[in-house]
């Protein structure tokens, strides 16, 4: 009976420790050595130009324009036009470099500390119940 209680306690402790380790954040990648991958690959040169698709010289009667179809409706305002409420950013103002990118949130590290304290509390409670 004592062997089964201690086996349950060891299994419970291993489960809680592995749970806390699985929730821990991964270490930050090191910037030492290695090859940096460029964000946009260079375009490859084509040896022969692609043949242009053939276009028929005379339009079909079904595609002929009528006065109703030739009149264009008024165009809606552009969605990306700058307004007074939303200032537009120029492409040079947007940063692509990873050194200026935001880091990972620190909320996960705080919750992992609480998870480890909770694991210790549950293990102590299980130890008291086993004894």
Swiss-Prot record:
Primary location recorded for the protein, binned into one broad class: membrane
User: What GO CC annotations are associated with the protein?
Assistant: plasma membrane; side of membrane
Q: Give the residues carrying a lipid (GPI-anchor amidated glycine).
A: 108
Provide the residue span(s) of the region labelled Disordered.
22-110
- UniProt lists compositionally biased (Pro residues) regions at 50-60
Give membrane topology per the record.
Lipid-anchor; GPI-anchor
Sorted keywords for this record are:
Cell membrane, Glycoprotein, GPI-anchor, Lipoprotein, Membrane, Proteoglycan, Signal
Signal peptide as annotated in the record: 1-22
Q: Where is the composition biased (Low complexity)?
A: 61-72
Q: In which tissues is it expressed?
A: Predominantly expressed in flowers and at a lower level in roots and leaves.
- Which residues belong to the propeptide? 109-131
Q: Tell me, what does this protein do in biology?
A: Proteoglycan that seems to be implicated in diverse developmental roles such as differentiation, cell-cell recognition, embryogenesis and programmed cell death.
Name this polypeptide is given = Classical arabinogalactan protein 1
Q: Name the gene behind this protein.
A: AGP1
């Amino acid at each position: 009976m004592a062997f089964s209680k201690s086996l349950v306690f060891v299994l419970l402790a291993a489960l809680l420790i592995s749970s806390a380790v699985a929730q821990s954040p991964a270490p930050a990648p090191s910037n030492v050595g290695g090859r940096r991958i460029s964000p946009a690959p260079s375009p490859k040169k084509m040896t022969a130009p692609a043949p242009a698709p053939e276009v028929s010289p005379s339009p079909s009667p079904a595609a002929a324009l009528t006065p109703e179809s030739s009149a264009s409706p008024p165009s809606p305002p552009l969605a990306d036009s700058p307004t007074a409420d939303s200032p537009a950013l120029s492409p040079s103002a947007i940063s692509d470099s990873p050194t200026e990118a935001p880091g990972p949130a620190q909320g996960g590290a705080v919750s992992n500390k609480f998870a480890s304290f909770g694991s210790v509390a549950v293990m102590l409670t299980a130890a008291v119940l086993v004894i």
